[in-house]
Structures are given as structure tokens and as C-alpha cells.
Amino acid sequence: MGQTVTTPLSLTLQHWGDVQRIASNQSVDVKKRRWVTFCSAEWPTFNVGWPQDGTFNLGIISQVKSRVFCPGPHGHPDQVPYIVTWEALAYDPPPWVKPFVSPKPPPLPTAPVLPPGPSAQPPSRSALYPALTPSIKSKPPKPQVLPDSGGPLIDLLTEDPPPYGAQPSSSARENNEEEAATTSEVSPPSPMVSRLRGRRDPPAADSTTSQAFPLRMGGDGQLQYWPFSSSDLYNWKNNNPSFSEDPGKLTALIESVLITHQPTWDDCQQLLGTLLTGEEKQRVLLEARKAVRGNDGRPTQLPNEVNAAFPLERPDWGYTTTEGRNHLVLYRQLLLAGLQNAGRSPTNLAKVKGITQGPNESPSAFLERLKEAYRRYTPYDPEDPGQETNVSMSFIWQSAPDIGRKLERLEDLKSKTLGDLVREAEKIFNKRETPEEREERIRREIEEKEERRRAEDEQRERERDRRRHREMSKLLATVVIGQRQDRQGGERRRPQLDKDQCAYCKEKGHWAKDCPKKPRGPRGPRPQTSLLTLGDXGGQGQEPPPEPRITLKVGGQPVTFLVDTGAQHSVLTQNPGPLSDKSAWVQGATGGKRYRWTTDRKVHLATGKVTHSFLHVPDCPYPLLGRDLLTKLKAQIHFEGSGAQVVGPMGQPLQVLTLNIEDEYRLHETSKEPDVPLGSTWLSDFPQAWAETGGMGLAVRQAPLIIPLKATSTPVSIKQYPMSQEARLGIKPHIQRLLDQGILVPCQSPWNTPLLPVKKPGTNDYRPVQDLREVNKRVEDIHPTVPNPYNLLSGLPPSHQWYTVLDLKDAFFCLRLHPTSQPLFAFEWRDPEMGISGQLTWTRLPQGFKNSPTLFDEALHRDLADFRIQHPDLILLQYVDDLLLAATSEQDCQRGTRALLQTLGNLGYRASAKKAQICQKQVKYLGYLLKEGQRWLTEARKETVMGQPTPKTPRQLREFLGTAGFCRLWIPGFAEMAAPLYPLTKTGTLFNWGPDQQKAYQEIKQALLTAPALGLPDLTKPFELFVDEKQGYAKGVLTQKLGPWRRPVAYLSKKLDPVAAGWPPCLRMVAAIAVLTKDAGKLTMGQPLVILAPHAVEALVKQPPDRWLSNARMTHYQAMLLDTDRVQFGPVVALNPATLLPLPEKEAPHDCLEILAETHGTRPDLTDQPIPDADYTWYTDGGSFLQEGQRRAGAAVTTETEVIWGGVLPAGTSAQRAELIALTQALKMAEGKKLNVYTDSRYAFATAHVHGEIYRRRGLLTSEGREIKNKNEILALLKALFLPKRLSIIHCPGHQKGNSAEARGNRMADQAAREAAMKAVLETSTLLIEDSTPYTPPHFHYTETDLKRLRELGATYNQTKGYWVLQGKPVMPDQSVFELLDSLHRLTHLSPQKMKALLDREESPYYMLNRDRTIQYVTETCTACAQVNASKAKIGAGVRVRGHRPGTHWEVDFTEVKPGLYGYKYLLVFVDTFSGWVEAFPTKRETAKVVSKKLLEDIFPRFGMPQVLGSDNGPAFASQVSQSVADLLGIDWKLHCAYRPQSSGQVERMNRTIKETLTKLTLASGTRDWVLLLPLALYRARNTPGPHGLTPYEILYGAPPPLVNFHDPEMSKLTNSPSLQAHLQALQAVQQEVWKPLAAAYQDQLDQPVIPHPFRVGDAVWVRRHQTKNLEPRWKGPYTVLLTTPTALKVDGISAWIHAAHVKAATTPPAGTAWKVQRSQNPLKIRLTRGAP
């Protein structure tokens, strides 16, 4: 089955030298690449039967040659040498071609489908297929193909195909049957036959037809059928890739099988069913049916032809006939085409881009893989010369980085071929360094880098030491010298020694260490100066200070201080932690310098607690213990013979401990010995269970974890943060330990996250913490199943009072990571001493990963499942790595602990022996103290809360509330206590700590000190919940019966939401019960709950009042509280406010429904029924409506016939607010009377009866906590409800049409409110502004014009006050009005209408003279408004000038068409203004050269030279080239106004028509080639009737549009054209009957008068900016008009004509308002004045 298939194309490529020789004999030259392209891709598209593998059939070659030599644009002259050479190969075949050429091939049809009939010819195909052609009567001698020896029929080791003879037709075979029988010779069977197809008969030696397997000639001369063997199908299936993996390889296999075996239709189905899946087979069959061609050689979709050529069901083809075999041959060809089409992958350039060169891959192998990717994932042929550039670029960019960089730097890269690039890449590849050389180079670079860094560090250290000693040596010289003299017993400084002088005996010639007089005995013990002295060294690399010195612990680290009574402040030399912002100057012998203080949050313990802050002086040689700390310690310095001793006031040695505030609670923990100490027995019996004896754990039953990533995740690489030397040295031992244990391993990963060194509090030890936040974002989220500590202890019954607590050490490291997930957690680490410089990653589950707790918790639960089953009497609680084992007796606890330790050891987990609490009755677990079935708060946690200082910032307050909130279960009413504190925690709120906050702060601390013990929930007993409510806070206690007593389980408290807090007390109790029941469910775990409260709320829940509760809230409460299986209500009890437990004495219960009914309304006697003996019966109404764009509102109180009160309300008042005002006014006017008031407003009615009381109790807040609308009006209404003696507010329908009293009164009130809204002044006394005497200047200056105007208006003069009065107001003079309004407008820049409305709404105390005229003048003369405001001027339409005959006047324009296929992005459109005829040309550029070219080459030859051309001011038209061409040709080129498309309206409208038509055509045809569809769009434009009912075609040619039926079979009748004389007569008629009337009509339009614009020469105008930026005025100017036309004008300063629609008039102040210059008394000053208009 491994035979290679030989085709004519492959045969020519194998003998390419002979092919070139034959081509040279034909005087042509051929190239191998183009030879393959033409044969496999080009010639099969000619539809003449040329196969992709080539053929030597002369008939097909002749047809291809005729297509190649076709004259005109359809020919292919570049293919002539190749088809001529191929024809020469067929006519004069060389020896290697002769076996594949028929002696005399008959002419072949153009289509592969054979017509029926005995004389039908077979379809053309490759010569390797059996040539089923009729034999020639004069049969030539049989060629000697095979040797006479009995060799195999087909040699499987050679590539040459077997010879095939000619196949005779059916009729010829019948006529020559006898001759063939007599002349046939039978050859001996081949030994290879059995190897090929099993038991097959040898073929007839003299047979004239070839054998088409599996059809064989039997002994009686009949064809027999031989199916595929199962071994063949099995080998083909298993030894080849699937169709989806490599479609090309499987297609080649099936093609070879179709050629060599000649299967029938059934065999083909069997072959496809074996090698392909169902979906692949369906796709192949569908593609094969698409390849069926009709009689015209084109693909067909006719069902009959498709089913005939490629049937889906078994056909009745007779394989013994020529017609049946031809059908079968065609079926195989179509099947092969379907395989090829179905195997084509969709274009995916990303796959090609993903092919990169491997580290050790040669460039040649990489290029082959790249080409294969091009063939598989793109439709491009990588061997095509046109694709060589793309392949070359991909080869460069996707090569190895070192090769790619060097290839990019090649000189003259554009001229390099792909072969040149491969050769250069091979040179670079061969010169690469070996892996050993690369490792050696990297090692040398690392060593050099480390050596440089080490030298730099040493140099920097030496410089720092030198500078420090130089600056501070003189500072302490006196102290050091004096102390040395004290030790030596003298007061003089010892003399200077020579270089060779002994310091002991003062003799020369030796040193002190070699002095013979120096005693050699053992050194005596040093005197102890402190109990906490751990050594003499004061710091790393520092000599101990001289005596007297004392060693103290600072932050857990021993520091040796020099006692310096001359130092005012104590000094630390090394970084003690965080430094404060305070600093101080230190004056020394060498000068002064500023140093910082440490923070004062340090607690020191010696004789007492003190707080101290050190001075941080890193340049000081030794730490100093100054007078400040000596004073606080009450230290005593005694001078003895051995030196100075520093002790406390009682004579004891001093000891000082410094630690952080968060670890302070550990000081208060009592170190109590456990009842059963963890001795050597537990350690020795279970060595594998303890981390101290068993080493690092490993969960043996857990498979390595695979961490799934999100679908869109990509690797993240974050560089390592800079790390100090101290931190690096601190975490180095931990990294080394983890590397030795195999938990960390070196790696190379695209992922990288930084490592953070975290300093352990109280020590100098660091631990490594990895920042995995970015990795956590890219990992899939899993649901967290870690238990909730809040209710975890609910599963611990009080009967189990013996406990064992185990803490698993390094728990996460017990779980392994899968190798595929390990690169996610890589980080950088460099350690030159260990030879590590790169990345490390975790092989175990790391800490800091978001899913680590859940994964470990689930794994440990699975591993401990068997232990729980085997020990059902024990309780095992697990919170991640903290285990709690509880038992009823000590023996059961010890037995269970042993079993648990054995299980943990076997499973591979390790517990910490230091933290273990084994078999005790009192243990600490999760921050609680468990003892005797109860849980307590630990004293350490209480002390932590008590020791916190008073908060000074919101953050400190949040920390306090968080710490105290952990203990809220022990504090009754915690929510109510902390209520004053929570508002200060919000961001943006002023932190104002007052007495209320201090009181709450102290109450919480006091409650915490008196916190009781809480019993553990017993899930076998029912729970009781006592609930109380006070001022919107729900409080409760959850209890369980313990004998005759109730033992508290938890104290619950919560604040109610704003809606529930505004309810009556009984309903607030319902809300409180619902809130606390939900919280208690977390502890009761669904057990029965009995609710006891001082209210009978069960009846309220069953029948809640609909006026207070919404439906959603009512349903929620009923579903929670009426679940009788879980919740039951107990009797009504009175609770103790302190303990929330029932009181001994019982109070009389109250009726909640009755109390609730009483609280529904604000006024008890308020009713909605008329009062019979009422004093007044009034009707109220309020209205709000829009009038002239302004909302007007009014309100009224009326009877049936008269208006009691009415008034206008401020503009913008809503109808609801107006109704409230009207009702409130009626109540005020009926004070002390009996009143019936009718209103048609449901809003006002419900507010008075129901909602008002609800709003008041709620604090006038909505359910979201926001202030309600109309708050002031609602408050006024609630206050006015109590004014009448008796009151009835009745609701009546609005807009009634009846004649009842209600209808008449409602209509009267509605009409009165509407009339009141139209008034200008509000008359209601409740909303009147108190009248006040307006401020009057000392005097008003009235001009003569003002006085004349005042007399005309009838004003009176007030002699007392000295001003004129009109309408009861002082009159402001015209000049003062101008100054006031001008200032107001400059502040607001409002329009005249808005300024009038503003002045009308804000009632002025003055009467402004000529106000409206002054407002108009001020706004019109404002320069800023003129430059910004839009213009409302409307310019009349002009008249467009048209030509008097076709071709004389054209409009031209460019329009852009996207997408720009083939480089065509623009369309140049010409429109004849006379006829509307359009010419459009696609162009690639928008230039003047293109315009001139189309004008001279297209417009001029067809229509003559235009007289006028119109266009916009585009660069292609306004350029010097276009204008010069127009001048030379005598064309009057008119450039239209800029930014005025209406000026070129005809061509602009045609642009839109053409683009709309192209859009429709592209949608209908499915193509994006608009250039191809442009003729159809032009046809539509030219044959569309215009405004006069004629199409441009009719105007131009004088004939109707050529609308014909293109599908009419009698279309030939329309081809008879009339004579030339008839055409001329028709044109003459058109000129007389069409052109002249059109020209006259156009002239009439020009003669009609056009309304000109109002601008004249000399006017000042503003010109519009067509392109404005941010904060830039819309208009520029003003400019002076120089010239005008009916539609345009030219201004001074702008060269182009401007359309009249783009300008607006500029108002200039009259001469009287110009600025005037006046002299003043000061000669250096002048006065500028301007009068009013």
C-alpha cells in the first residue's frame, strides 16, 4: 500500500532536464515554478477537461492551446511557451512518456459527461487513468512494456506507473470478440498479484481492454466484482492521519486508491465510511455535488443533472457497458474534487504566524514548515512568485530571535530572494554557539556582574564607615577617653606606642600577644550588667561599646547601649522600624546635622510601663542610653572598682522589651501548663504525625492539582521589586530550606510575579510572601467551601467537653501541583553562592493563591472522611488547617486523638507539636475559649480592645469597630451602642468626636469586660429567641433550656432600615423579629425556633395592615415567620431591658391591631364622610400647565358659586404641590370651625389621611433614605390638620359633568385655580413676601427726556423723598436702567426674553423706565453674544444657472466611496445642467491631473468643449493646474461658495443618488465591487424622469429609454436599427420640441425676481467660522461689505465670496452712545463716559 502515485505533472518534474531540452528545441524557455502553476491551477479553470495533475491527451492539449492563443484580451501570451512544450511532449514523446500516450487518441468532447449512445466517447482525464477508448481495427503491434521473464506485474519499488492499453467501445468489442478470442495470449500469473489484491486471476495477455479493479474478467468472459479486503481497509485507517488532522495526506491516499483499484459506487461508500467520520463524509459529498458541471461546462444546481452525475443512492449503472464505466469515472473525479474542496482549511493567518523556528531547528526545515502552513491555512501558494515577499517577511519575522535580528540588518534586503535569505540564515545558524559555550558565557557574565556588585558594595561600605567615623569621632571622644581611663585606674591618657613596642610590658621588639611576661591563664568571667544581656555585640559588624554598657531588647533584638549621662536623648544607630515625621538637630564636635525620631507607638516594660521614642542617628558609633530614658527607668549608676553598674530603683538589673501594638495582647496571656503536657510519649508514638519529627508533609492520596485558567488569560510577567540586602539575607535561609525539600525548583516560565520580604513583628526574621494578585485575576474562580467561623461551632454539642486542638504546619505544602500548573507561580531569585540566577517555582500549593484554602479544605475533608465514619461518637471540626476533636470523656478523647494522629501521619499531614492542645477540658480554638460546653472571649482579645487608644481618624475607628464587632455576640445591644460611631466611618465625613461618641466608646469597652459565657448550640434542642425593639434597633438573645434555666447562646442586634424604622412600635417589632430570625438561622442550622416578644405579632403577620407594608415586604415576612415547621410564636412576655430575658412580673398585654389602627391617622377624629352640621363646605384644587413654553401653576379654595381664595404659584410648581398648598390654605382659613373640604387629588387626600403620619414617623425619608419631595408643604399640611374644630377631608372625582353639588364645586375650584395661575402676583398671605421699603439712593438724576416720558405715563413726583413714583414704585432713570441691565447682561449673557422673565419673577422695587427697549439694545450690542450666538436669519432660495443646450454647462465634483476596492476610492461625477446627463469615473486619487485627464479624454470627444464648469472650492478644482487648463480651453470655471453645498446642488444630489443605488446593488448582489456595479447605477440615473417628466436619455437622444426584456427569446427583432436619416430626423425633432422649450423654461426661472439678502455695501457683518475649536467663538469680525450679489457678498479682509447665509448683521452703537472724553480737575486724569441709547 506504500506505492507512490505517478502523474503526468510529477513525471515531467522528474525529467525536467528533458523538458527544458524539448522547450529549447521549440525556441522557448520554461520555468519549473510557472510550469507547475499553469498545470495545476491555471489550465483546469479553462473548463476543457484539463486535470490538475496534467495529461498527455492531444485533444485536451489542443483545446487548452486554442484558449491560450485566443486573440484579444482573453488570450494568455505568457503561457504560450508552456503549452507548446507540453504539446511537443505529446506529439513526439520521449521514452519516459510513451507508456502513457495512446497510439492515436480520438477527439474528445469538452464536457466530461458522455451522451448516451453506442458511439459515445469517454471523458478526458489523466493518462494514468485507464484510457477507456475504442481500439483501432488495424491494431498496431503490441508494445513490449514488460520483460518476458515472469516478474511482477507492478513493481512496487519503482515510481513508474503500469501501462494501460486502449479500451474498445461496446460495439467494437462485440464485432471483434471472435478475433480477440483467437489471437489472445495468456501470460503466466504474476507473483505480485496475490500481494496486491488477494486471490485474483491473471489477466488475459491479449485483451484489448484494461482491467478496472475490482471489476475482473472471469473465465467465461464476464466481468466479476472483487470487493476491498478488510486488511486493506484496516491498514488505511490505522496507518494514516484523520481527515481533520491532515486532509491533504488522506486525500492523496484516496486518490491513489481510486486510480489503482478502480472501485465501484459501493466500494467508494465503504471507503468513505471507513476513513471519514459522519460529519466529514457529509461535507465531502456536499462539496462533490457542488462540483457537478452542466452541458455548458459551468457548475450546475439542477437536481436532475446533479443526481445523474453524483447520486446519493445506489445507481443502476451497468459496469459492463462503456456508459456505466464512464459514469463511474465521472463519479470518482467528482468525489476527488469534493475531497479536495472539503479539505481546504479556512484562511487563518494566525496559524501561519504561530509557526516559529525551534531552538535547534535548521532554517531549511523551518521554511518547509512555514510553506506547509501557508498551503494548509491560506489560499495562497507559497511557491507563487507573487507571494515570495510575504513568505520572505514571515521567514524573517518568525525565525529565531538571533537569526531574525541579523536578517533584518542585511543590506539591500528588498533585492534578496527567499533562497538568499535561507542561505544567510544557514550561515548564522551554523555559526551559533553551542549550549556548552552559551552556558559558559552566561556563567562568566554572572560572575563578572556579581564581582562588580560585590566590589561596589565593599567600596560603598568602606566609604560609609569612613564618613561615619570621621564625622562622629570627635562627638564622643571625651566620653570614650574618660571611660578608658577609669578602666585603667588612671586619669591620664596612655602614651602613644611605637610600631614595634609591646602594649603590656612597654618593651620593644615584640607585641602584646607574644609578650613573655603576660599571664596565659584562663580569662575570668565578665561582670553581668543585665539579665537580658545576650552578648557583647551591639549590632552586626560593630564592636561592643566601652563600659558602662547595658543590653536591652528593642523589638525583640538585643541592643547594647553605651550609658551616656551627657547625652540628652537616647540614640539608635540601626533602623528600628517606622520613623516619624519629627526631626531634631544634633550638635557635635564637627558640626550639626538633622536626624529623625522613631515613632512613639512603642511599649517598654521595666519597673513599669513607659512609652519612649529614640533618636535615629545612623552615623553614631554606638547606641546611646541618654538621660531621657534613664530618668524614666529611675536608673541608678554605681561606680565600683570593677566599673559602673546600672540598676533599677530596687537594685535589680534593668530589662526593657519593645514590641508592636498589635502583639500587645500576648503580654497578657497567662502561660498555663496544660492538664496533659505534650511529652515525649506523644512525639515518640506518632513520629510521622508531627512536623518536628516527620519533616515536611505530603498528601499521598491526593493527585497533583491542575489550576485552570480563564479562557482569555495570557501570561503576566512582573519584574521583581528592589529588595534590601537585609531582607534578602533574611529570606535566603527559607528559600534554601524549600529548595532542599524540593518545594521550590528552578524553572523557565513566561509567568513571573514579585517576591515580597515580610518582616515578622518583634524580630528581625523575614519570611517570603509572593504577590499573586495578578495570577489570581487570571485563574478561574471556584466557589469557596471553607466553613464559616460564625456558625462552625454550632456543630459542637455541649455534651462533648474534652477537646484536642491540632494546627497543621505548612498545610498548603502538603498538596502537589501538576507540572503544567507549576509555571504559573514562578518568581525571580538570585543567589551567586548557590549558583542560582533565574526563576524558581512551587511544586506544592503556594500561599497567597486565592483558591488554596478551598482546595486544601476540600482535600483534607476527603482524606478524613473515613476517620469520621469509623468514629461516629467523636466530633471533628475542621477550619482549613485547624482541627478540633471533641469527645464526651477523657478516655474517648485520648483514643480518638491517637487514631487521628495515626491517620494524619499515614495520609502525609504534619501537625505542630508546639501549638497542640491534647485532651484538655479548656482549649483555644479560632479565637474562642472552649470550656464546659461554653465559649468565652479570651482575656488576651479583651485586653487588645481595651488597650487601643481613642480613635482619632476614621481608619482607626474602623479598626476598633472591626475588633469589637468580632465580639458582638457577647454584647447585648451592640448595634445600638455603636450607632453614634458608624456615621464617622464614612469617607468624606468630618471626623467630629464628641461626648456621644466617647460615651458609646466607653460603653462598648465596659460591655466587653463584663461579657458573659455563651453556651454552645445544641442542635438536638429547640431554640428560643427573645426579641425587643427600641428606637429602630432590633435586639435579641438566642437561648436554650438547661434544666430550669435558659442559657444564652448569642446576643443579636441590628439596625432597622429607614422604612421599617418609621412604622408604629408593633410593626417595628415585626421587622425586628424578621431581621433577627434571619441572623439566628445561621446558628440554629434550621432547628425549631420559638419567638418570644412583648407584642402579639403573630396576628399582625397573618393580617398585616396594607397601608404600612408593601406587597413584597409582606410576602417576605409571611414566608419567613409563618413557617410553622421551623418558627413558632410563644406567649407575650415582658423583657428586661438589660438582659432581654423575661421579667418575673407580667404586664397586661396590649392589642397590637387596636393600637395600629389608632396610629393610622394624624388626627383621631379625621374622617372622609361629610359632617352634617359643618360651618363651611369648601372645594380645593391646584393646577399646573404649560403656556408659551412656561409652566404656570395656581391654587384655589371655592364654594359652589364663589371663590374664597385663589392665587398664582411660582413658575415650575407641580400639580401635587399646588394641591397641598390649596388644602393647607383651606385648613388655615377654617381655624376653629367645622369644615367639610373636598379635593380631587388622591395625593393630597392620602397624605392627610395615611401617608403624612408615615412620613412623619419615618423622618420624612424615602425607602432609599433620601428626603421626600414637597417636604415643607407636607409639614405645613400636618400642622394645619389640627386647626379646625372638626374636620372631614373628602375625595371627589375630578372633571365631573353632573349637576350635583360636588360636581359644581369641583368645576368651580378647577376654573378658579386656572384663572389664578394666569395672574402676575400671588395674593395668598401664606406665600407673600413681606413688603419692605426699597433702598433709595440719595437722589435720582432725571434727564429732560426722562421727565417728558414720565409726564406722558402719568407719574407723580414725591417731594419728600425726591423721586418720581409710578404704579406705587420709585421710577429709575433711563441711564440708571441702562447701567443696571448692562451689568446684569454682562454677568449672565441671557437673551432678551430670559432677562424679561428673570426681572418679572424677581419682583423689583423699582419701576424701570424704557426697560424692554434697553434690554433689546444691551443684548444686540453685546460683542460676546454676537460672536457666539447662532443666527436666525433666513435667506431666500436663489436661482441656479443652467445651460441652453446639452454639453455647454457642467457641474463637477469628487465623492468618496468606501470600501476602496482595487485602489479606487473616489468617484469623479460630471452632470450636464441642461439635460441632467451624468458621467462618473472611478479614480484612485483626488487630484487636478485626474480632472483634466477625464475632461480632455472623455467629456470633450463625446460632448464637445464645455463653456461653463461649476464646482466647489476643492483643491483639485481650485488648483493652478485646473484653472490653467480652463483658461487655455476657454472654459469659464465658476467656483461656488465654500461650505455651501446648495450652490452645487445638482451634482451633490447626483452623488447621493449614485451612492444610494450602489448600496442597494451591493446588498442585492452580495458583492463589494462597486466599480463593477457602476454602469447599472449610471443606467438608473440616466433613465430617471426629471422635474419636467423627461429622462436625461430622452432629452439627449430623443428616444425613449431602451427598456427591453433581456430574457425575451425574440430579442433578435430589436436589433434592426433604423436608418441614419431616421436618426437625424429624430434629433431635429428633439431640438425643436424639447431643447427649445427647456431652454425657455430655464430662462423664465432666471427672469423671475429673486428676493435679495438685506446686506448692503458698507454694512458691518459677522462671518461664520466653519471650523471651530473648544471655547472658540462661532463668528469672526465684524467685516465691512464691499460687493454684493443676490446670494453672496465680498467683505474686506477675506478674498473669497461668502454666501449670504454664512453672515449676520453686526449692530453698531449709535453716535450718541459713543465714549466721550471729559477733563477733570486733576490734570493727570480724564473721565470716559457713555450715554444710554
From Swiss-Prot:
List the molecular function annotations (GO) for this entry: aspartic-type endopeptidase activity; DNA binding; DNA-directed DNA polymerase activity; RNA binding; RNA-directed DNA polymerase activity; RNA-DNA hybrid ribonuclease activity; structural constituent of virion; zinc ion binding
GO CC annotations? host cell plasma membrane; membrane; viral nucleocapsid
Feature: compositional bias, Basic and acidic residues: 449-464, 484-497
Q: Could you tell me which residue ranges the RNase H type-1 domain spans?
A: 1172-1318
* Every Peptidase A2 domain range: 559-629
Gene Ontology BP terms: DNA integration; DNA recombination; establishment of integrated proviral latency; proteolysis; symbiont entry into host cell; viral genome integration into host DNA; virion assembly
**Where are the residues of the annotated region Disordered?**
108-218, 449-497, 511-549
What SUPFAM superfamilies does UniProt report for this protein, alphabetically? Acid proteases, DNA/RNA polymerases, Retroviral matrix proteins, Retrovirus capsid protein, N-terminal core domain, Retrovirus zinc finger-like domains, Ribonuclease H-like
**Motif location (LYPX(n)L motif)?**
128-132
Query: Which residue stretches are annotated zinc finger (CCHC-type)?
Result: 500-517
Report the residue ranges that make up the Integrase catalytic domain in this protein.
1442-1600
State the EC number(s): 3.4.23.-, 2.7.7.49, 2.7.7.7, 3.1.26.4
Q: Which residues bind RNA?
A: 721, 771, 773, 787, 851, 853, 1054-1055, 1082, 1184, 1186, 1242, 1266
* Ranges spanned by the short sequence motif PPXY motif, renumbered to the chain: 161-164
Chain sites annotated for binding Mg(2+) 2: 1181, 1310
**Record's keyword annotation contains NADP:** no
Positions binding Mg(2+) 1 in this chain are 807, 881-882
What this protein is called in its record is Gag-Pol polyprotein
